[in-house]
């Protein structure tokens, strides 16, 4: 049975976020004036490791970085970063905690 957590996500970029997924669920992030997409979700079910998927579009060489926190603790191992190439950047991965 999955344990539930408070999940906070921050995606910093000047690119356009096309799709963000956690554990296979499409998650809508809100873009703020400081070019950061954010969301906080209470009681999010996770089993063992947290799977994520990020797809951004924009100008080539535009960078993005992802930060994920569980129960107010940053679990992002090394910085999760990407760079737009050929108009897009898509990254999939998982975090063990």
Give residue spans per PLM region.
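Beta-strand-rich recognition domains
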Residues: 1-21, 36, 43-97
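Short beta-strand segments within Ig-like beta-sandwich modules, predominantly Fibronectin type-III
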Residues: 27-35
């Amino acid at each position: 049975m999955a344990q539930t957590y408070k999940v906070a996500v921050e995606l910093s970029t000047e690119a356009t976020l096309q799709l963000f997924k956690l554990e296979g669920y499409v998650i809508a992030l809100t873009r703020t004036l400081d070019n950061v997409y954010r969301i906080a979700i209470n009681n999010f079910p996770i089993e063992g490791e947290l799977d994520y998927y990020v797809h951004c579009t924009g100008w080539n060489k535009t960078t993005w970085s992802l930060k994920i926190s569980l129960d107010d603790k940053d679990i992002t191992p090394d910085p999760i970063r990407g760079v737009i190439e050929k108009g897009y950047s898509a990254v999939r991965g998982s975090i063990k905690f």
